[in-house]
Amino acid sequence: MGSVLGLCSMASWIPCLCGSAPCLLCRCCPSGNNSTVTRLIYALFLLVGVCVACVMLIPGMEEQLNKIPGFCENEKGVVPCNILVGYKAVYRLCFGLAMFYLLLSLLMIKVKSSSDPRAAVHNGFWFFKFAAAIAIIIGAFFIPEGTFTTVWFYVGMAGAFCFILIQLVLLIDFAHSWNESWVEKMEEGNSRCWYAALLSATALNYLLSLVAIVLFFVYYTHPASCSENKAFISVNMLLCIGASVMSILPKIQESQPRSGLLQSSVITVYTMYLTWSAMTNEPETNCNPSLLSIIGYNTTSTVPKEGQSVQWWHAQGIIGLILFLLCVFYSSIRTSNNSQVNKLTLTSDESTLIEDGGARSDGSLEDGDDVHRAVDNERDGVTYSYSFFHFMLFLASLYIMMTLTNWYRYEPSREMKSQWTAVWVKISSSWIGIVLYVWTLVAPLVLTNRDFD
């Protein structure tokens, strides 16, 4: 009897796996908007992929991965192939994830509403989509080595660079939303309390940035060397000061009354993180001490010796993973009314989301079964670009690939280590990020004929 009930329970999931409504999450949660639930499912699938990629790097997994035909053959370099199998496995797994999201991105170009037949693919058929993704990932493990890893290293670097910029855009959006929320509460009542909270958060961010700058100069520079690090730290410090001053200029405040130092402080902290991340990728070990050596432990060489495993888990990589998770899930649930950020992320403004969300009373809830269904709030128009969302997850897959492998590049004839290319990618992304933030401040003054409300 129990087995019959179990089969009946499993059968109730079939509409979720093959139907047009994403009820995978809704079975456990109250009914939600189709637009939000769908994005959360895609984000959770990417999170599962990240967890599997982390497992690939666990010591001992190379014995299982070596069983794949041709996966570790004809490799004669400084680093033994059995040490590199985790590195290669992450590349192939992330290649499969990236191709899955890229195909969906191309398929969803110019989808305008949920009435488009392609929207049913985006919002449903989960079993078939995930089965296709798994098939692509498995197939990626049988791609001949050749130049695959080298080519995909450069593709991953370009994609990770773009995703870092998207992280910055989402961070700008978060900072604006945070500031607006607290300013509104400050204006509604108990102004002293909220003003103190706003001031404390801003001061804390700037204090963290100042401490970071001091530590950078102490540990990542030397009087007679490390000139690149000195330049990176100094330039980014000056750029952050300039952006902070610009955010409170009278002209800027006149065009954007709610711009302020809180947003600038958040951008400053993120810029300091990118600066640190760039310096930790420098090939010269004297200008790139490990975190363990800084806190008092012995430093290990970037290039492993015979029989040693590669040190994958660096502090900046762990922080990078945390930022990645926050940004992906924030992009899945965000409903922003910041028009400049919405234009950059191809997302509708908050008013559209509210109007669509009100469609529940019009019978948009699925009738005729007891399964919780998502509310179709996109019948009149999508609330975000399906194509751009999948493209962002495509870039996120590449970012994860580079983060988990510490941006290392392996050349069989030589060794595996950090490259100056990775340093310049990260440091240039920090500069472009500050430029993007400054543009959100000055755009209303430059483009006076456009509405930025």
UniProtKB/Swiss-Prot annotation:
Keywords recorded for this protein, A-Z: Endoplasmic reticulum, Lipid biosynthesis, Lipid metabolism, Lipoprotein, Membrane, Myristate, Phospholipid biosynthesis, Phospholipid metabolism, Phosphoprotein, Transmembrane, Transmembrane helix
Residues recorded as bearing Phosphothreonine in the entry: T352
Residue(s) carrying Phosphoserine: S351, S361, S364
Principal localisation: endoplasmic reticulum
Record topology, Cytoplasmic segments: 2-39, 110-123, 173-197, 253-259, 331-387, 448-453
Compartment(s) of residence: Endoplasmic reticulum membrane
Pfam family name, one: Serinc
InterPro entries noted in UniProt: TDE1/TMS
Residue intervals on the Lumenal side: 61-88, 145-151, 219-231, 281-309, 409-426
Assembly with partners or alone: Interacts with SPTLC1.
Protein name, as recorded: Serine incorporator 1
Annotated organism of origin: Pongo abelii (Sumatran orangutan)
Lineage, broadest ranks: Eukaryota, Metazoa, Chordata, Craniata, Vertebrata
